[in-house]
Amino acid sequence: MRTVEDRSLEFLIRRDREAELPPLASLCCNYFKQRHWRDAFDDEQASLREELWAVKTQLDTIPMEAYTATRNKLFPLALSGEQQQFSNRAGHKLLESMESTGVWMELSKLLCGKSRKRPRDFAFADVCGGPGAFSQALFKAGRKQGWRHLHGYGMTLAGVSGLDWYNSLLNSPQFTCTYGLDGTGDIFKLSNIDCLVSITKAAPMFLVVADGGFSVDFSVANYQETISSRIMYGQWLAALKLLRKGGCCVLKLFDTFSPLSRAVVYLSCFLYSRVHVAKPRHSRVVNSERYLVCVDFLGYPNEAWGRYLDCFYELGFVDNEHVPELMPREWCLQDEIFMADMRDMNMTVATNQMTALQMILNAASAVEEELKAKETTTRTSAESDDSPLSSRESCKDG
Protein backbone atom coordinates (compact mmCIF):
# COMPACT_ATOMS: atom_id res chain seq x y z
CA MET A 1 0.00 0.00 0.00
CA ARG A 2 1.25 3.48 -0.87
CA THR A 3 2.25 5.65 2.09
CA VAL A 4 3.16 9.31 2.52
CA GLU A 5 4.79 11.48 5.16
CA ASP A 6 4.87 15.16 6.02
CA ARG A 7 7.43 16.83 3.77
CA SER A 8 7.74 20.14 1.96
CA LEU A 9 6.39 20.42 -1.57
CA GLU A 10 6.72 23.37 -3.91
CA PHE A 11 5.01 24.03 -7.23
CA LEU A 12 5.92 26.75 -9.71
CA ILE A 13 2.76 28.15 -11.29
CA ARG A 14 3.42 29.72 -14.68
CA ARG A 15 1.37 31.46 -17.33
CA ASP A 16 1.74 31.67 -21.08
CA ARG A 17 4.12 34.61 -21.62
CA GLU A 18 2.30 35.34 -24.85
CA ALA A 19 -1.06 35.57 -23.11
CA GLU A 20 -2.80 38.93 -23.25
CA LEU A 21 -3.32 40.91 -20.08
CA PRO A 22 -6.77 40.04 -18.67
CA PRO A 23 -8.97 43.06 -19.54
CA LEU A 24 -10.41 43.68 -16.09
CA ALA A 25 -11.41 47.20 -17.11
CA SER A 26 -13.93 45.70 -19.52
CA LEU A 27 -15.86 44.04 -16.69
CA CYS A 28 -18.85 45.66 -15.03
CA CYS A 29 -18.34 46.94 -11.49
CA ASN A 30 -22.04 47.34 -10.77
CA TYR A 31 -23.06 43.69 -10.88
CA PHE A 32 -21.29 40.44 -10.04
CA LYS A 33 -22.66 36.94 -10.55
CA GLN A 34 -23.18 35.28 -7.19
CA ARG A 35 -23.14 31.65 -6.15
CA HIS A 36 -23.75 30.17 -2.72
CA TRP A 37 -20.58 28.67 -1.29
CA ARG A 38 -22.06 25.18 -1.76
CA ASP A 39 -22.36 25.83 -5.50
CA ALA A 40 -19.21 27.91 -6.03
CA PHE A 41 -17.25 25.15 -7.79
CA ASP A 42 -17.22 24.25 -11.47
CA ASP A 43 -16.44 21.05 -13.36
CA GLU A 44 -12.66 21.65 -13.47
CA GLN A 45 -11.05 18.59 -11.79
CA ALA A 46 -14.46 17.82 -10.31
CA SER A 47 -13.83 14.06 -10.21
CA LEU A 48 -10.61 14.57 -8.21
CA ARG A 49 -12.35 16.93 -5.81
CA GLU A 50 -15.29 14.56 -5.30
CA GLU A 51 -12.96 11.61 -4.76
CA LEU A 52 -11.13 13.59 -2.08
CA TRP A 53 -14.42 14.58 -0.45
CA ALA A 54 -15.54 10.95 -0.40
CA VAL A 55 -12.42 9.89 1.49
CA LYS A 56 -12.85 12.77 3.95
CA THR A 57 -16.46 11.74 4.56
CA GLN A 58 -15.34 8.26 5.64
CA LEU A 59 -13.61 9.89 8.61
CA ASP A 60 -17.04 10.71 10.07
CA THR A 61 -17.18 7.17 11.48
CA ILE A 62 -14.02 7.63 13.56
CA PRO A 63 -14.31 9.23 17.04
CA MET A 64 -12.35 12.47 17.22
CA GLU A 65 -10.04 11.20 19.98
CA ALA A 66 -9.15 8.13 17.92
CA TYR A 67 -8.65 10.21 14.78
CA THR A 68 -6.31 12.65 16.54
CA ALA A 69 -4.30 9.88 18.20
CA THR A 70 -3.96 7.99 14.91
CA ARG A 71 -2.97 11.11 12.99
CA ASN A 72 -0.35 12.07 15.56
CA LYS A 73 1.03 8.54 15.61
CA LEU A 74 1.37 8.33 11.83
CA PHE A 75 2.44 11.94 11.26
CA PRO A 76 4.30 13.03 14.42
CA LEU A 77 6.08 15.99 12.79
CA ALA A 78 2.94 18.11 12.72
CA LEU A 79 1.77 17.69 16.31
CA SER A 80 -0.45 20.52 17.49
CA GLY A 81 1.22 22.91 19.87
CA GLU A 82 4.78 22.15 18.81
CA GLN A 83 6.81 24.88 20.50
CA GLN A 84 10.45 24.11 19.88
CA GLN A 85 11.12 27.59 18.50
CA PHE A 86 7.80 29.43 18.17
CA SER A 87 4.53 29.60 20.08
CA ASN A 88 2.84 27.32 17.53
CA ARG A 89 3.41 25.48 14.24
CA ALA A 90 2.41 28.44 12.06
CA GLY A 91 5.86 30.00 12.32
CA HIS A 92 7.48 26.85 10.99
CA LYS A 93 5.04 26.72 8.09
CA LEU A 94 5.77 30.29 7.07
CA LEU A 95 9.55 29.92 7.13
CA GLU A 96 9.43 26.60 5.30
CA SER A 97 7.23 28.11 2.58
CA MET A 98 9.62 31.03 2.18
CA GLU A 99 12.65 28.76 2.11
CA SER A 100 11.30 26.34 -0.51
CA THR A 101 10.26 29.13 -2.88
CA GLY A 102 13.37 31.31 -2.68
CA VAL A 103 11.79 34.24 -0.85
CA TRP A 104 14.73 34.63 1.54
CA MET A 105 17.15 34.82 -1.36
CA GLU A 106 14.97 37.36 -3.16
CA LEU A 107 14.62 39.57 -0.10
CA SER A 108 18.34 39.38 0.67
CA LYS A 109 19.14 40.46 -2.86
CA LEU A 110 16.59 43.25 -2.67
CA LEU A 111 17.66 44.55 0.72
CA CYS A 112 21.42 44.35 0.35
CA GLY A 113 21.63 45.90 -3.09
CA LYS A 114 25.25 46.59 -3.95
CA SER A 115 26.39 46.54 -0.34
CA ARG A 116 26.12 43.49 1.91
CA LYS A 117 27.43 45.40 4.90
CA ARG A 118 24.46 47.72 5.40
CA PRO A 119 21.11 46.16 4.51
CA ARG A 120 18.27 48.50 3.68
CA ASP A 121 15.50 49.01 6.20
CA PHE A 122 12.81 46.39 5.84
CA ALA A 123 9.16 46.27 6.95
CA PHE A 124 6.60 43.51 6.82
CA ALA A 125 2.84 43.39 7.34
CA ASP A 126 1.13 40.56 9.19
CA VAL A 127 -2.49 40.59 7.98
CA CYS A 128 -5.11 38.68 9.99
CA GLY A 129 -2.08 37.61 11.98
CA GLY A 130 -3.16 37.36 15.61
CA PRO A 131 -1.80 36.12 17.93
CA GLY A 132 1.39 36.68 15.96
CA ALA A 133 3.21 33.43 15.17
CA PHE A 134 4.18 34.72 11.72
CA SER A 135 5.58 37.96 13.14
CA GLN A 136 7.38 36.04 15.85
CA ALA A 137 8.99 33.81 13.23
CA LEU A 138 9.98 36.73 11.00
CA PHE A 139 11.71 38.61 13.79
CA LYS A 140 13.66 35.50 14.75
CA ALA A 141 14.59 34.79 11.13
CA GLY A 142 15.41 38.46 10.55
CA ARG A 143 17.96 38.42 13.34
CA LYS A 144 19.51 35.33 11.80
CA GLN A 145 19.66 37.07 8.42
CA GLY A 146 21.29 40.13 9.99
CA TRP A 147 18.33 42.44 9.29
CA ARG A 148 18.62 44.72 12.29
CA HIS A 149 16.24 47.40 11.02
CA LEU A 150 13.21 45.14 10.68
CA HIS A 151 9.79 46.55 11.59
CA GLY A 152 6.48 44.72 11.61
CA TYR A 153 2.94 46.02 11.22
CA GLY A 154 -0.02 43.89 12.17
CA MET A 155 -3.80 43.93 11.88
CA THR A 156 -6.10 41.34 13.42
CA LEU A 157 -9.64 41.19 14.78
CA ALA A 158 -10.08 43.10 18.02
CA GLY A 159 -11.57 41.55 21.12
CA VAL A 160 -11.51 37.95 19.89
CA SER A 161 -10.15 35.37 22.32
CA GLY A 162 -7.02 33.71 20.99
CA LEU A 163 -6.30 36.45 18.45
CA ASP A 164 -4.80 39.04 20.80
CA TRP A 165 -1.20 39.78 19.85
CA TYR A 166 1.48 38.14 21.96
CA ASN A 167 2.72 40.46 24.69
CA SER A 168 6.23 40.16 23.30
CA LEU A 169 4.98 41.85 20.12
CA LEU A 170 2.82 44.46 21.83
CA ASN A 171 5.77 45.48 24.00
CA SER A 172 8.24 45.59 21.12
CA PRO A 173 9.24 48.96 19.61
CA GLN A 174 9.73 47.05 16.34
CA PHE A 175 6.06 46.13 16.03
CA THR A 176 3.07 48.38 15.35
CA CYS A 177 -0.46 47.02 15.54
CA THR A 178 -3.63 48.64 14.25
CA TYR A 179 -7.28 47.71 14.28
CA GLY A 180 -8.19 49.75 11.25
CA LEU A 181 -10.34 52.81 10.79
CA ASP A 182 -13.25 51.54 12.88
CA GLY A 183 -11.20 49.80 15.57
CA THR A 184 -12.47 46.30 14.77
CA GLY A 185 -9.53 45.04 12.71
CA ASP A 186 -12.10 43.52 10.35
CA ILE A 187 -10.43 42.92 6.98
CA PHE A 188 -13.85 42.51 5.34
CA LYS A 189 -14.03 46.31 5.40
CA LEU A 190 -11.92 47.90 2.66
CA SER A 191 -11.56 51.04 4.79
CA ASN A 192 -9.61 49.04 7.38
CA ILE A 193 -7.22 47.75 4.73
CA ASP A 194 -6.76 51.29 3.45
CA CYS A 195 -6.05 52.43 7.01
CA LEU A 196 -3.19 49.92 7.24
CA VAL A 197 -1.95 51.11 3.84
CA SER A 198 -1.98 54.70 5.10
CA ILE A 199 -0.06 53.83 8.27
CA THR A 200 2.63 52.02 6.27
CA LYS A 201 2.82 54.52 3.42
CA ALA A 202 6.39 55.55 4.22
CA ALA A 203 7.57 52.07 5.26
CA PRO A 204 9.80 49.91 3.03
CA MET A 205 7.10 47.24 2.80
CA PHE A 206 8.75 44.29 1.07
CA LEU A 207 6.86 41.39 2.64
CA VAL A 208 3.19 40.74 3.41
CA VAL A 209 2.15 37.54 5.17
CA ALA A 210 -1.42 36.45 5.77
CA ASP A 211 -2.59 33.44 7.77
CA GLY A 212 -6.24 34.36 8.24
CA GLY A 213 -8.98 31.78 8.35
CA PHE A 214 -11.57 30.34 10.65
CA SER A 215 -12.81 26.98 11.78
CA VAL A 216 -15.78 25.55 9.92
CA ASP A 217 -18.25 23.00 11.22
CA PHE A 218 -17.21 19.42 10.59
CA SER A 219 -20.38 18.86 8.56
CA VAL A 220 -19.30 21.41 5.92
CA ALA A 221 -15.53 20.91 6.09
CA ASN A 222 -15.41 19.98 2.40
CA TYR A 223 -16.50 23.53 1.57
CA GLN A 224 -13.82 25.31 3.59
CA GLU A 225 -12.26 26.71 0.42
CA THR A 226 -15.40 28.48 -0.77
CA ILE A 227 -16.57 29.42 2.72
CA SER A 228 -13.20 31.17 3.16
CA SER A 229 -13.38 32.98 -0.20
CA ARG A 230 -13.94 36.43 1.25
CA ILE A 231 -11.08 36.40 3.74
CA MET A 232 -8.76 34.81 1.18
CA TYR A 233 -9.46 37.52 -1.40
CA GLY A 234 -9.26 40.31 1.18
CA GLN A 235 -5.79 39.24 2.29
CA TRP A 236 -4.62 38.89 -1.31
CA LEU A 237 -5.92 42.38 -2.11
CA ALA A 238 -4.29 43.80 1.03
CA ALA A 239 -0.91 42.51 -0.15
CA LEU A 240 -1.33 44.23 -3.51
CA LYS A 241 -2.14 47.53 -1.82
CA LEU A 242 0.63 47.29 0.78
CA LEU A 243 3.66 46.00 -1.14
CA ARG A 244 6.42 48.03 -2.73
CA LYS A 245 7.70 46.91 -6.10
CA GLY A 246 10.00 43.94 -5.70
CA GLY A 247 8.22 42.72 -2.58
CA CYS A 248 6.84 39.26 -1.80
CA CYS A 249 3.71 37.86 -0.22
CA VAL A 250 2.78 34.59 1.48
CA LEU A 251 -0.94 33.80 1.74
CA LYS A 252 -2.63 30.75 3.24
CA LEU A 253 -5.05 28.90 0.97
CA PHE A 254 -7.11 25.79 1.41
CA ASP A 255 -8.09 23.73 -1.62
CA THR A 256 -7.53 25.44 -4.98
CA PHE A 257 -10.39 23.96 -6.99
CA SER A 258 -12.82 26.90 -7.11
CA PRO A 259 -12.97 29.46 -9.96
CA LEU A 260 -12.18 32.27 -7.50
CA SER A 261 -9.04 30.60 -6.14
CA ARG A 262 -7.97 29.83 -9.70
CA ALA A 263 -8.55 33.43 -10.82
CA VAL A 264 -6.58 34.85 -7.88
CA VAL A 265 -3.60 32.62 -8.68
CA TYR A 266 -3.85 33.45 -12.39
CA LEU A 267 -3.95 37.21 -11.85
CA SER A 268 -1.00 36.83 -9.49
CA CYS A 269 1.00 35.52 -12.45
CA PHE A 270 0.60 38.96 -14.08
CA LEU A 271 1.29 40.90 -10.88
CA TYR A 272 4.47 39.12 -9.75
CA SER A 273 7.55 37.82 -11.54
CA ARG A 274 7.19 34.38 -9.96
CA VAL A 275 4.29 32.52 -8.37
CA HIS A 276 4.45 29.32 -6.31
CA VAL A 277 2.15 27.15 -4.27
CA ALA A 278 3.94 25.62 -1.29
CA LYS A 279 2.91 22.78 1.01
CA PRO A 280 5.39 23.05 3.92
CA ARG A 281 6.26 19.94 5.88
CA HIS A 282 4.75 21.33 9.10
CA SER A 283 1.42 21.64 7.29
CA ARG A 284 -0.24 18.29 7.78
CA VAL A 285 -0.39 16.11 4.69
CA VAL A 286 -3.88 15.07 5.85
CA ASN A 287 -5.32 18.55 5.27
CA SER A 288 -5.84 20.83 2.27
CA GLU A 289 -3.85 23.80 3.56
CA ARG A 290 -1.20 25.27 1.27
CA TYR A 291 0.41 28.67 0.72
CA LEU A 292 0.38 31.00 -2.27
CA VAL A 293 3.86 32.52 -2.45
CA CYS A 294 4.34 35.44 -4.83
CA VAL A 295 7.81 36.83 -5.52
CA ASP A 296 8.88 40.21 -6.96
CA PHE A 297 5.79 42.41 -7.06
CA LEU A 298 5.52 44.27 -10.37
CA GLY A 299 2.75 46.68 -9.42
CA TYR A 300 -0.64 46.99 -11.09
CA PRO A 301 -0.44 46.83 -14.90
CA ASN A 302 -2.71 49.88 -15.00
CA GLU A 303 -4.95 51.94 -12.72
CA ALA A 304 -8.06 50.18 -13.99
CA TRP A 305 -6.91 46.94 -12.36
CA GLY A 306 -6.67 48.59 -8.95
CA ARG A 307 -10.12 50.16 -9.27
CA TYR A 308 -11.74 46.92 -10.39
CA LEU A 309 -10.13 44.73 -7.72
CA ASP A 310 -11.21 47.19 -5.00
CA CYS A 311 -14.72 47.41 -6.43
CA PHE A 312 -15.01 43.64 -6.59
CA TYR A 313 -14.16 43.34 -2.91
CA GLU A 314 -16.45 46.12 -1.74
CA LEU A 315 -19.49 45.35 -3.91
CA GLY A 316 -19.02 41.72 -4.92
CA PHE A 317 -19.09 40.16 -1.46
CA VAL A 318 -22.61 41.08 -0.40
CA ASP A 319 -22.48 38.66 2.54
CA ASN A 320 -20.52 35.68 3.84
CA GLU A 321 -22.80 33.14 2.17
CA HIS A 322 -22.10 33.94 -1.48
CA VAL A 323 -19.03 33.96 -3.71
CA PRO A 324 -18.92 36.48 -6.58
CA GLU A 325 -17.37 35.83 -9.99
CA LEU A 326 -14.09 37.72 -10.28
CA MET A 327 -13.69 37.22 -14.02
CA PRO A 328 -14.87 34.85 -16.76
CA ARG A 329 -13.51 31.37 -16.04
CA GLU A 330 -12.45 31.01 -19.68
CA TRP A 331 -9.65 33.53 -19.16
CA CYS A 332 -7.86 30.99 -16.98
CA LEU A 333 -8.91 27.86 -18.80
CA GLN A 334 -7.59 29.01 -22.16
CA ASP A 335 -4.05 29.40 -20.76
CA GLU A 336 -2.77 25.85 -21.22
CA ILE A 337 0.52 26.40 -19.39
CA PHE A 338 -1.21 27.83 -16.33
CA MET A 339 -3.87 25.13 -16.24
CA ALA A 340 -1.30 22.34 -16.59
CA ASP A 341 0.60 23.65 -13.56
CA MET A 342 -2.57 24.10 -11.50
CA ARG A 343 -3.83 20.63 -12.36
CA ASP A 344 -0.51 19.04 -11.49
CA MET A 345 -0.39 20.85 -8.15
CA ASN A 346 -3.98 19.95 -7.27
CA MET A 347 -3.47 16.34 -8.30
CA THR A 348 -0.28 15.93 -6.25
CA VAL A 349 -1.58 17.56 -3.07
CA ALA A 350 -4.97 15.83 -3.25
CA THR A 351 -3.46 12.41 -3.99
CA ASN A 352 -1.06 12.70 -1.05
CA GLN A 353 -3.91 13.85 1.16
CA MET A 354 -6.13 10.91 0.16
CA THR A 355 -3.28 8.48 0.81
CA ALA A 356 -2.68 9.98 4.26
CA LEU A 357 -6.37 9.85 5.12
CA GLN A 358 -6.57 6.22 3.98
CA MET A 359 -3.61 5.42 6.23
CA ILE A 360 -5.58 6.87 9.15
CA LEU A 361 -8.71 4.93 8.18
CA ASN A 362 -6.71 1.69 8.07
CA ALA A 363 -5.02 2.24 11.43
CA ALA A 364 -7.78 3.95 13.42
CA SER A 365 -9.57 0.83 14.69
CA ALA A 366 -6.41 -0.55 16.29
CA VAL A 367 -5.61 2.81 17.88
CA GLU A 368 -9.19 3.09 19.14
CA GLU A 369 -8.84 -0.31 20.84
CA GLU A 370 -5.58 0.84 22.43
CA LEU A 371 -7.32 3.93 23.79
CA LYS A 372 -10.18 1.85 25.20
CA ALA A 373 -7.73 -0.55 26.85
CA LYS A 374 -5.80 2.34 28.33
CA GLU A 375 -9.02 3.91 29.62
CA THR A 376 -10.06 0.61 31.21
CA THR A 377 -6.67 0.23 32.88
CA THR A 378 -6.81 3.79 34.18
CA ARG A 379 -10.34 3.31 35.54
CA THR A 380 -9.40 0.04 37.24
CA SER A 381 -6.37 1.66 38.82
CA ALA A 382 -8.44 4.58 40.05
CA GLU A 383 -11.06 2.25 41.56
CA SER A 384 -8.29 0.30 43.30
CA ASP A 385 -6.86 3.48 44.79
CA ASP A 386 -10.29 4.46 46.13
CA SER A 387 -11.03 1.05 47.74
CA PRO A 388 -10.92 0.56 51.59
CA LEU A 389 -7.55 -0.36 53.07
CA SER A 390 -6.81 -4.07 53.42
CA SER A 391 -6.37 -5.49 56.93
CA ARG A 392 -2.61 -5.71 56.49
CA GLU A 393 -2.45 -2.04 55.37
CA SER A 394 -4.65 -1.10 58.35
CA CYS A 395 -2.23 -2.76 60.73
CA LYS A 396 0.71 -0.97 59.18
CA ASP A 397 -1.04 2.36 59.58
CA GLY A 398 -1.86 1.55 63.15
UniProtKB/Swiss-Prot annotation:
Ranges where the RrmJ-type SAM-dependent 2'-O-MTase domain occurs = 85-298
Record-linked SUPFAM superfamilies = S-adenosyl-L-methionine-dependent methyltransferases
* Enzymatic reactions: a 5'-end (N(7)-methyl 5'-triphosphoguanosine)-ribonucleoside in mRNA + S-adenosyl-L-methionine = a 5'-end (N(7)-methyl 5'-triphosphoguanosine)-(2'-O-methyl-ribonucleoside) in mRNA + S-adenosyl-L-homocysteine + H(+)
A Gene Ontology cellular component where this protein is annotated is: nucleus
Its domain of life?
Eukaryota
Xref: Pfam families: FtsJ (PF01728)
**Top-rank EC class of the record's enzyme:** transferase
Question: Where does this protein hold S-adenosyl-L-methionine?
Answer: G132, D211
Alphabetic keyword roster: Methyltransferase, mRNA capping, mRNA processing, S-adenosyl-L-methionine, Transferase
One example of the protein's molecular function in GO is: mRNA (nucleoside-2'-O-)-methyltransferase activity
Which positions are catalytic residues? K252
Q: Does the keyword Transferase apply?
A: yes
The record's Gene Ontology biological-process terms are: 7-methylguanosine mRNA capping; methylation; mRNA modification; mRNA processing
As recorded in UniProt, its EC number(s) are 2.1.1.57
Region annotated Disordered, chain positions: 371-398
User: Which PROSITE patterns does this one have?
Assistant: SAM_MT_RRMJ
Function (record text): S-adenosyl-L-methionine-dependent methyltransferase that mediates RNA cap1 2'-O-ribose methylation to the 5'-cap structure of RNAs. Methylates the ribose of the first nucleotide of a m(7)GpppG-capped mRNA to produce m(7)GpppNmp (cap1).
What is this protein's name?
Cap-specific mRNA (nucleoside-2'-O-)-methyltransferase 1
